[in-house]
């Protein structure tokens, strides 16, 4: 999605990380109007990053209106209040501020960055964006054309094709079963009124999470929150219920004329609030978490040369979790690639990990964690995400302790519980040799 990112050279320095991640002191702030936010004060530079998250995301689309929330979020930068698109862009640029908007299946996000000297004017402009979007027809037609161009491109991308097929097989008629940016047919049919309806569904206080980092005090943030958000409705549209993961083991081949097949694979996963999550997180790092030491990378790439990269990853969405992976291989090698992945999945479930693998995974994951705190905007995003995941406010300080507390017995027990080789389904897009759909 396009987003306004008018960050000047003067503002670039404002993305420097806080000095020491372990010293990040998070405060919970409640505004006079009752809006809660998490704050990290940093007065070393005259700059603040603000992250707003609204739970529900594109899953709030009404039946027959798929893509409405995604398109609505893309239009937020196209004018607000008395300002049409060009005047809005000029106003934002004059403030040396940056606003960006995004929508995924669980969340609509607004990220804002502004200098302290321009804070009040930037917040006034952002307030108009949230409360008074214009959704002018010319802007709607322009952004719709961009979304449609993206959808046409996605229709030719093997990775996107695989993703859409997997989502439909895994989640069926649930909103997770279709992509949030919609289809060519659904997006073409969306109207200006649909944008106002989507806006009303999303922007409410009962699904709001706020993170702030930078040159702002608790009192100043409280006043800002009320100015910006106090007039939002108390409640938005109902959030859909949990999604049943219905995908079963097997192979689905999608014919596509390309010399290399793309495979997306997975089965039911584990939610973020599951007490086994940290063991699962370490387990995934060992199986296919991205390093060259992972079992999948070792067996599929290093030993057999079947691919340049193979990965597995946990996808703990709000309403339903899957455990997934991806790989690409030549049409003549993809059948062997699938077989090796199936074998390693089953082997790890049956035999577990070694003491050394667990120790190495702990070292990697605890060492990499501080690198996430690489700028005020990133930290503000983390603060909002922590709240959405219902994590405690001291999570930053205790997270690595939780990783290190996982025992060998615990991780191997979890491996047997969450790795389900018989339920592993492969979506293969290409013209694979020696591989056919099983259902």
Per-range role (PLM):
Residues 1-10:
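Bacterial N-terminal signal peptides that target proteins for export
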Residues 2, 87-236, 253, 303-304, ...:
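Charge-rich, well-structured scaffold segments of protease-associated domains
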Residues 18-22:
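Sec/Tat signal peptide C-region and signal peptidase I cleavage site
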Residues 23-42:
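Short N-terminal segments immediately surrounding and downstream of signal-peptide cleavage
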Residues 24-26, 51-113, 156, 179, ...:
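M16/MPP (pitrilysin/insulinase) zinc-metallopeptidase core fold and M16-derived inactive scaffolds
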Residues 38-39, 46-49, 59-62, 273-274, ...:
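Short, solvent-exposed loop/turn elements at domain surfaces
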Residues 42, 51-53, 237-293:
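His/Glu-based metal-binding/catalytic segments typifying zinc-dependent metallopeptidases
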């Amino acid at each position: 999605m396009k987003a306004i990112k008018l960050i000047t050279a003067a503002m670039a320095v404002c993305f420097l990380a806080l000095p020491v991640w372990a010293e990040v002191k998070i405060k919970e702030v409640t505004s006079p109007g009752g809006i809660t936010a998490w704050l990290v004060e940093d007065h070393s530079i005259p700059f603040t990053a603000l992250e707003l998250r609204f739970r529900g995301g594109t899953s709030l689309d009404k039946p027959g209106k798929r893509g409405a929330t995604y398109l609505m979020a893309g239009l937020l930068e196209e004018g607000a209040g008395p300002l049409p698109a060009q005047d809005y862009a000029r106003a934002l640029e004059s403030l040396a501020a940056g606003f960006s908007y995004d929508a995924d299946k669980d969340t609509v996000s607004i990220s804002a960055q502004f200098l302290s000297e321009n804070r009040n004017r930037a917040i006034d402009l952002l307030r108009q964006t949230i409360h008074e979007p214009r959704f002018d027809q010319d802007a709607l037609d322009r952004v719709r054309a961009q979304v449609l161009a993206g959808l046409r491109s996605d229709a030719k991308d093997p990775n996107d094709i695989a993703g859409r097929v997997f989502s439909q097989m895994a989640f069926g008629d649930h909103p997770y079963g279709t992509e949030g940016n919609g289809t060519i047919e659904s997006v073409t049919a969306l109207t200006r009124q649909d944008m106002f309806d989507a806006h009303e569904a999303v922007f409410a206080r009962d699904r709001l999470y706020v993170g702030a980092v930078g040159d702002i005090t608790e009192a100043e943030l409280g006043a800002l929150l009320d100015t910006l958000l106090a007039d939002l409705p108390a409640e938005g549209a109902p959030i859909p219920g949990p999604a049943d993961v219905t995908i079963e083991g097997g192979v689905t081949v999608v014919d596509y004329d390309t010399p290399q097949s793309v495979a997306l694979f997975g089965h039911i996963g584990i939610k973020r609030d599951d007490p086994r999550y940290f063991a699962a997180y370490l387990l995934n790092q060992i199986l296919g978490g991205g390093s060259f030491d992972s079992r999948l990378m070792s067996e599929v790439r290093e030993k057999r040369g079947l691919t340049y990269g193979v990965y597995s990853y946990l996808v703990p969405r709000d309403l339903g979790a899957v455990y997934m992976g991806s790989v690409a291989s030549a049409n003549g090698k993809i059948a062997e690639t699938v077989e090796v992945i199936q074998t390693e999945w089953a082997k790890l479930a049956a035999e577990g990990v070694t003491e050394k693998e667990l120790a190495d995974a702990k070292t990697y994951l605890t060492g990499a964690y501080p690198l996430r705190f690489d700028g005020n905007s990133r930290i503000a995003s983390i603060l909002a995400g922590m709240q959405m995941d219902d994590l405690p406010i001291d999570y930053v300080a205790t997270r690595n302790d939780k990783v290190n507390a996982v025992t060998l017995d615990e991780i191997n027990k979890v491996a047997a519980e969450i790795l389900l080789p018989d339920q592993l389904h492969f979506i293969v897009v290409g013209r694979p040799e020696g591989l056919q759909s099983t259902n």
